Amino acid sequence: MDIRQDYPLSKRNTFGIAARTDWWIDYTCDADIDRLVKDEFFQECRVQTIGEGSNLLFLANFHGILLHSEVKGITELHKDQDSILLRVGSGMVWDDFVAYAVENNYYGIENLSLIPGQVGASAVQNIGAYGVEVSQLIEAVHARHYRTGESRVFRNEDCRYAYRYSIFKEPDYAEWAIMYVDYRLRLRPSFSLEYKALAKVLEEERITPTLQSIRDTVIRIRNSKLPDPATIGNAGSFFVNPVVSAEKFNTLQTEYPSIPSYPQPDGSVKVPAGWLIEQCGYKGHRSGAVGVYEHQALVLVNYGGATGTQVGALAEEIIGNVRQKFGITLHPEVKYIL
């Protein structure tokens, strides 16, 4: 376990916000959690779990303890002719796990290449891209309650997965520190190529689908649309794509015939938040140190020196204008930390 006081966070969040935390703690194993459960000072402090800081926005310095996983390793639990079950440490970098799966010919997560963050965060956020959500592949999440010390295995159904949602986003489950995530990946060749943007590139460039070619293509597409946080601070997609009723969508389509849409199994329709934002004139918008990325309106950026409150203010301005123009309220995918 590594403990640091008055710790700078500019390199611990992809927005590059120059906040600080009173305490930063890296945990690596169950024994570290056991120690924290017995520590009186820790138990009296405000605690927030944090991954790679790729899906949050610090609005101020954090007064308390940020708890960060350094649990590493990949263990093979079971293997048959069709699939393999892997247990992965929550502190492993997500894209390193994707690369490992591709190198070993394990199918299922190649479409999720280059998504920033840790393995633990994948289970919290239910990350998704190019037609795949990680909840389709998660069997179980192993967690420790950092107040009581309780150990619990959350089966997939326990996590109540939905679009960009899991039970771990609820306040009642915020004090669970994720230790490991179990993924069942496929051993037989099988690809998810229903997503139009990905399928179009593969077809136009006559790329034969393989694990590596799909990973390479996804990485290329993402790099063309999203800025590198090392160069321009950002948290990727800032807003969740809204889901509206069929009736609401039909009304919108009458006024905006070119509006993109993704029909959902329950009859509702998902609308790209980036398109809504772009229609309000924000693509490429800049106000001082903050702005909207020129190649993807869903991405808010820190050009250097911006505060979290400045980014948050731009987000609220966008929310208000989208609501006024379309009657749709956008919700941040990024978590605000006060």
UniProtKB/Swiss-Prot annotation:
Name all FAD-binding PCMH-type domain ranges.
17-188
* Localization (cell): Cytoplasm
User: Which EC numbers does the record give?
Assistant: 1.3.1.98
Give a Gene Ontology cellular component term annotated to this protein. Answer: cytosol
Q: Where is the active site?
A: R164, S237 (proton donor), E333
User: Principal place where this protein is found?
Assistant: cytoplasm
What PROSITE patterns does the record point to?
Answer: FAD_PCMH
Cofactors demanded by this protein: FAD
Q: Which InterPro entries match?
A: FAD-bd_PCMH (IPR016166), FAD-bd_PCMH-like_sf (IPR036318), FAD-bd_PCMH_sub1 (IPR016167), FAD-bd_PCMH_sub2 (IPR016169), MurB (IPR003170), MurB_C (IPR011601), MurB_C_sf (IPR036635), Oxid_FAD_bind_N (IPR006094)
Could you say which enzyme class this protein belongs to?
oxidoreductase
Domain of life per record: Bacteria
Question: Which GO BP terms, alphabetically?
Answer: cell division; cell wall organization; peptidoglycan biosynthetic process; regulation of cell shape
* Disulfide bond positions: none
Task: State a single Pfam family of this protein.
Answer: MurB_C
Its UniProt pathway annotation is: Cell wall biogenesis; peptidoglycan biosynthesis
Stretch forming the signal peptide: none
Task: List the keywords (alphabetical).
Answer: Cell cycle, Cell division, Cell shape, Cell wall biogenesis/degradation, Cytoplasm, FAD, Flavoprotein, NADP, Oxidoreductase, Peptidoglycan synthesis
Task: Give the transmembrane region(s).
Answer: none
Any one GO molecular function term: FAD binding
Q: Which reaction does it catalyse?
A: UDP-N-acetyl-alpha-D-muramate + NADP(+) = UDP-N-acetyl-3-O-(1-carboxyvinyl)-alpha-D-glucosamine + NADPH + H(+)
Q: Which family does it belong to?
A: Belongs to the MurB family.
Task: State its role.
Answer: Cell wall formation.
This chain's protein is named: UDP-N-acetylenolpyruvoylglucosamine reductase
* Gene source species: Porphyromonas gingivalis (strain ATCC 33277 / DSM 20709 / CIP 103683 / JCM 12257 / NCTC 11834 / 2561)
